[in-house]
Amino acid sequence: DIACKGSIKELLDYQFSTNEIAAVVAERDVEWWQNRASVLTTPQLASGYFNAGFLLINIDEWNLNNISSKAIEMLRDPDWVSKITHLDQDVLNVLLNGKVKFISEKYNTRYSINYELKDKVDNPVNDDTVFIHYVGPTKPWHEWADYPVSRSFLIAKAASPWSKEDLLKPVNSNQYRYC
């Protein structure tokens, strides 16, 4: 549920530091980080917790550190599962703790299309935004998501093999309430 809106050149040129596994974008604020650190019994997360919607991964370091295997092991452990509320995001924050670099929010600008239904909306998507991360139940591939913030997705769709595919119609009461 991410659409590219800007140039990815800086990401293509990105050089990972020694032992750095990923470049990530912070999630929420310090209060949230402290909450996740406490719940996940990982005190270091109090200094930074990332959103897993966007990850620039150093594949060599990822594989060297067996991140995929360790993630699956964590998800099989009932003690960990009882703490996890944000599935892959919680797991990756624990496993990659201290091995990530926090980069600009322009690479994961989160926005819910449903905010458009409010009287006043503060849209963080701007000219600097590289990736729009569509959070919330309405996505730009839904036919009722006819808002300017959907434009980046629609441009990409028009240039894709799916250009002739219809946007999705509402199929349940939750979706109907937003159209």
Name every feature range the model reports, one short phrase each.
Residues 1-33, 49, 54-57, 65, ...:
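GT-A fold catalytic core of metal-dependent nucleotide-sugar glycosyltransferases
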Residues 8-10, 41-42, 118-119:
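A generic local structural motif
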Residues 10-13, 36-39, 70, 147:
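Short, glycine/charged-enriched secondary-structure capping and boundary segments
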Residues 29-45:
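Surface-exposed acidic, glycine/proline-enriched linker/cap segments
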Residues 45-47, 51-179:
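A glycosyltransferase accessory/donor-loop signature
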